[in-house]
C-alpha cells in the first residue's frame, strides 16, 4: 500500500470517528475468531483502537465450541433444544469454568497486550446481569409442551451503572454471559441474546455480532447472495420463509430485540475477515449485513 492510499484510508475513517465519538458499541465476540490466534489478535487490536479514538466498546463473549470440548473431555454429551444448551448442575460448572475461568481472562490479556485497559466480568459481578429461569416450549404433535432446560436463564435487568462507571474511566468491559437471581442462583445465558439486552440497556449506538459467516445470505455457500441492509420486518419474513434458519435465528432475534430497545443499527460480520470490526465502523461501505428498524 503506497503512502497516498494509506492516507486515503485514514481520511475515510475521520467522519465515522467524529460520528461515533463517545458512543457505546457492544461487540458480541464469538465463532472462529475466538479460537484462531491471528484472528484473536486483529479483533483485540480493533477493539483497542476503537477505545483510543474515543468510542466506548463493550464486549460480551460466547464460548460454545470450547464448552463442548470441555464437556466431551469429562464424558458429557452436549444437548441443545432450539439452539439453547440444556444445562444441568455439572454442565453449569463446566460452562462457568470455561467462560469465566479461561475465555474471559484470555480476552482481557489479549486486549492488555495491545494497550487496552480491560476488565473481566461475569453477569454475577455486582449483579451485572440479573436473570431468571427461562421457560422454553416446543411444539410436538401440534401440542405446545414445556421443556426443562435446567440452569438456562434469560435476562431480567442489566446493572448499567457498573458498565457506565467502567466506561467513564476508559476501561473496556469484557462480560461472560452468566446471570444471577435474587436468591443467588446462577444461570447460563445465550450470549447473543444477552448482548442484545446489554446493548439496549446501555443505549448503545451499534451492536456488532462477530460470527463465522459474511452476513445474512440467500445461499450460505454463495457470498454474492449477501444482504447488505435489512429491516426488522424483512428478517421476520425471511425466518418465516426458511431463508434464515438454524443457529442464525437466535442471533437475528437478539438483533431485533436490541433494535426495539433503541439501538440504532445491528451488524452481522465475519470474524474470519481481518479487521472486520474496523471495516464495519470506519468505512463508508461497511461490511456484513446491517439490520435497522423499519
UniProtKB/Swiss-Prot annotation:
InterPro entries: AceGlu_kinase-like_sf (IPR036393), AcgluKinase_fam (IPR004662), ArgB (IPR037528), Asp/Glu/Uridylate_kinase (IPR001048), NAGK-C (IPR041727). It is found in: Cytoplasm. Coiled coil: none annotated. Belongs to the acetylglutamate kinase family. ArgB subfamily. It comes from Methanococcus aeolicus (strain ATCC BAA-1280 / DSM 17508 / OCM 812 / Nankai-3). GO terms for biological process: arginine biosynthetic process via ornithine; L-arginine biosynthetic process. The gene is argB. Catalyzes the ATP-dependent phosphorylation of N-acetyl-L-glutamate. This is Acetylglutamate kinase. It comes from the Archaea.
Amino acid at each position: 500500500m503506497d503512502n497516498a492510499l494509506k492516507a486515503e484510508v485514514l481520511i475515510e475513517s475521520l467522519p465515522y470517528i467524529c460520528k461515533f465519538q463517545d458512543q457505546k458499541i457492544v461487540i458480541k465476540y464469538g465463532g472462529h475468531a475466538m479460537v484462531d490466534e491471528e484472528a484473536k489478535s486483529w479483533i483485540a487490536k480493533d477493539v483497542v483502537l476503537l477505545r483510543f479514538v474515543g468510542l466506548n466498546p463493550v464486549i460480551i463473549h460466547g464460548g460454545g465450541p470450547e464448552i463442548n470440548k470441555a464437556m466431551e473431555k469429562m464424558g458429557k454429551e452436549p444437548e441443545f433444544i432450539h439452539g439453547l444448551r440444556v444445562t444441568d448442575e455439572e454442565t453449569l460448572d463446566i460452562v462457568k469454568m470455561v467462560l469465566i475461568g479461561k475465555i474471559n481472562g484470555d480476552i482481557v490479556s489479549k486486549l492488555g497486550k495491545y494497550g487496552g485497559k480491560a476488565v473481566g466480568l461475569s453477569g454475577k459481578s455486582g449483579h451485572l446481569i440479573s436473570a431468571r429461569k427461562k421457560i422454553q416450549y416446543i411444539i410436538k404433535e401440534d401440542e405446545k409442551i414445556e421443556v426443562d432446560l435446567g440452569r438456562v436463564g434469560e435476562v431480567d435487568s442489566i446493572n448499567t451503572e457498573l458498565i457506565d462507571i467502567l466506561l467513564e474511566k476508559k476501561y473496556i468491559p469484557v462480560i461472560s454471559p452468566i446471570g444471577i437471581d435474587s436468591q443467588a442462583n446462577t444461570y447460563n445465558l445465550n450470549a447473543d441474546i444477552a448482548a442484545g439486552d446489554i446493548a439496549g440497556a446501555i443505549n448503545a449506538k451499534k451492536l456488532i455480532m462477530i460470527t463465522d459467516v459474511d452476513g445474512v445470505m440467500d445461499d450460505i455457500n454463495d457470498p454474492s447472495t449477501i444482504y447488505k441492509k435489512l429491516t426488522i420486518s424483512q428478517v421476520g419474513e425471511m425466518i418465516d420463509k426458511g431463508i434464515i434458519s438454524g443457529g442464525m435465528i437466535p442471533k437475528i432475534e437478539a438483533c431485533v430485540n436490541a433494535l426495539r430497545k433503541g439501538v440504532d443499527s445491528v451488524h452481522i460480520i465475519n470474524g474470519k475477515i481481518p479487521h472486520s470490526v474496523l471495516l464495519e465502523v470506519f468505512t463508508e461501505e461497511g461490511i456484513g449485513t446491517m439490520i435497522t428498524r423499519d
